[in-house]
Amino acid sequence: MKMTKIIAALMLVLMTLVVAGCDKDNNQQSNKSTNTVVENKTEKPAEEKIKIKVYFPNSDATKLVAVDKTVKVAGTTKYKAAMDALMEGTDDSKLTTVIPKQAKLLGVTVNGDTAKVDFDKGLIKHFNGGSTGEEFLVGSIVNTLTDFPEIKRVQITIDGRNVETLKGHMDVSKPLSRMDELLK
């Protein structure tokens, strides 16, 4: 009887050690997993930057001038980043920002060699230019996007719909090719 009590006590101690040992391993493994997660959360993704050309009219409205800009493309496409840079405008007093500040870019999509640029109605409503201004507005958009070699044509839409013209002077109902005549 004494021997069975000793064996039972030893078995109890042995089982306690086994359970405690398993628990300790699980805690260590759990800590390793937690550490890995924390390390991954603190990593920052590399911000990709590219150099592009953005086209602005000169202050005399006689030609478009290419301006080199470096833009971040993390979380967006290079085409949208280029349009955002065009919409930011320029600080150069010899150049003019042509897209109204109130206009909103709704999106840029590419299908084959054609980019579709969608603005809200603010582009039309707040644009103040005449026929030359409209030509430079369209030319700035088209030439900025066709500076990417894979883009050959640009379709400008308003609220997702094709429009005949922005202000009555220039047909934008179909995709437009690069406007090199404005670069003289």
Segments and roles (model prediction):
Residues 2-184:
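Bimodal "functional hotspot" detector
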